[in-house]
Amino acid sequence: MEILRIEPTPSPNTMKVVLSYTREDKLSNTYKKVEETQPRFINQLLSIDGITSIFHVMNFLAVDKAPKADWEVILPDIKAAFSDANKVLESVNEPQIDNHFGEIKAELLTFKGIPYQIKLTSADQELREQLPQTYVDHMTQAQTAHDNIVFMRKWLDLGNRYGNIEEVMDGVLEEVLATYPESQLPVLVKHALEENHATNNYHFYRHVSLDEYHATDNWKTRLRMLNHFPKPTFEDIPLLDLALSDEKVPVRRQAIVLLGMIESKEILPYLYKGLRDKSPAVRRTAGDCISDLGYPEALPEMVLLLDDPQKIVRWRAAMFIFDEGNAEQLPALKAHINDNAFEVKLQIEMAISRIENGDEALGSVWKQMANRTI
């Protein structure tokens, strides 16, 4: 059994190791600790410092590392684990990984729809911040004697952010306070005490017109409108296009998110505006939307992002080219083969290899990995 190649995945803490051997049982297993009943090579990999789990299915392994572990140290050890009996790839000697501008997951802790804490999680950090005391007080007012607080509290996914985690926290706090102003808290408490919250579903949607949005001079109100906007249609594009010119980054970012929900090639020009935004967070979000839509027509625009100053944006561009690219993108990929960010360089190498070998992109594999049972 040999390692054919090692590929990055959308998760910075997971690498895909493609093997020359395909499982005949068509089963999958997740391994988290060394056990005698497991395959020897699995135990060898689990013995490597920094590896936390291995998912084995078909002809590949999804290897997870600890957030603070370094792929530059782990990858040669993975290859060495196969070297006793197998031919392996030569160890790569990549530059130091820059973790200062990475992907950050933002979540909001709520009880009966009343927010009271923010949590940010990056590859190597977790940061929490409680909302002002009045939010905690109103959350307490919404409790009844029969409430199971632990069961009824809920983490709301606010999506991904990008940048320095302390600066991101400041921005997310500003967004949350704009979306849930103090003046709205008594209404939320009243609703919490009157309604049956067994479903724990508290998101309210309200459609606004272009005229109503345009007449609003408070950016917090505009953001609140977008955050409570239902799934948009083509008729909403003028409003969202206007929001792309907003002075506040959270408004522009949310406009991009909503545009991405209109699953049509016709919205690509508006997403391209996001790719040129002065905020890296907006550029990356636009790249994510384009990647989710998967239209090859966006390749020329995504190729331009290989020159973006932020690695998290360049990585998204390289990943999209890996998924959708063809021989036309090879010159641009080869021109950027020496990118100074490890993840970007590796993704560019894989895109070149896939295109030159004529291999198909395995988008369905990412879904299988994301949905695997841990």
From Swiss-Prot:
UniProt key word Methyltransferase: no
Pfam families with a match to the protein in the record: HEAT_2, Nfu_N, Virulence_fact
Key word Transcription regulation present: no
InterPro entries linked: ARM-like, ARM-type_fold, Nfu/NifU_N, Nfu/NifU_N_sf, PBS_lyase_HEAT, Virulence_F_dom
Gene Ontology terms, MF aspect: oxidoreductase activity
Top-level division of the source organism's lineage: Bacteria
Keywords, comma-separated and alphabetical: Virulence
Membrane-crossing residue ranges in chain numbering: none
Role: Required for hemolysin production.
Family: Belongs to the CvfC family.
Record-linked PANTHER family: CONSERVED VIRULENCE FACTOR C (PTHR12697:SF37), PBS LYASE HEAT-LIKE PROTEIN (PTHR12697)
Protein's recorded name: Conserved virulence factor C
Origin species: Staphylococcus aureus (strain MSSA476)
Gene: cvfC
